[in-house]
Amino acid sequence: MGIFITPLWSEYIVSADQGGIFMDHFNVYSDIQARTGGEIYIGVVGPVRTGKSTFIKRFMELLVLPGLEDVHARERARDELPQSSAGKTIMTTEPKFIPKEAAKLSLGDGVEVRVRLIDCVGFMVEGAAGHIENEKERMVRTPWYEEEIPFTAAAELGTRKVITDHSTIGLVVTADGSFGELKRENYVPAEEKTVQELKKLGKPFLVLLTSSRPYSEETRNLAKELETKYEVCVMPVNC
């Protein structure tokens, strides 16, 4: 069974080399469908501790799981959902494709695609926890090196690979500092780095600004500032 998704991102998905000019949403989706053979990989990237994993869980719960008629397939997909929690501690440790098997989504107007989301650690931010152990940076194993490497280096490498090698569309998730224990300014350097990487590659992307008060005037003003700064549309959301 396929899942119908209204074109929520319609005019918001733009290519960096278009200078922020909006495209008709069906033209965007049809073009991506043609270029990718109907397989769309959404790279959910950005700073750590912004709600990337929470967004993926909500996306799956609302758009993917209800469309899985096979109860065993549905339970397997549910078991694959990423962990998420409040606070400063980083929960994600490596890139992960979700669901394991691509889910069919109907975008309307005869456009059908198969979608997978890619979760990743994200670029490090000041104040985050979980990468230091016994006053030293954790050393972790990765699929890319035989030896262990520092957690921060692994997180950066994995995030860049999601952006460069795996994603068809980028979804930059950042935060306004209204929830959790990190301030808005902590996220800015990693946020800028993520946007620069996507623009350099010319990949279509949009920005989600996670907030505990997405409809407030303050949050909407920040979204407008980021739209001007990055020349893409920014959507305030509460995941």
Stretches found by the model and what they are:
Residues 204, 211-239:
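Canonical P-loop GTPase G-domain recognition
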Residues 172, 207-209:
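Structural beta-sheet core signal
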Residues 157-158, 179-202:
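Amphipathic helical hotspot of TIR/SEFIR-family domains
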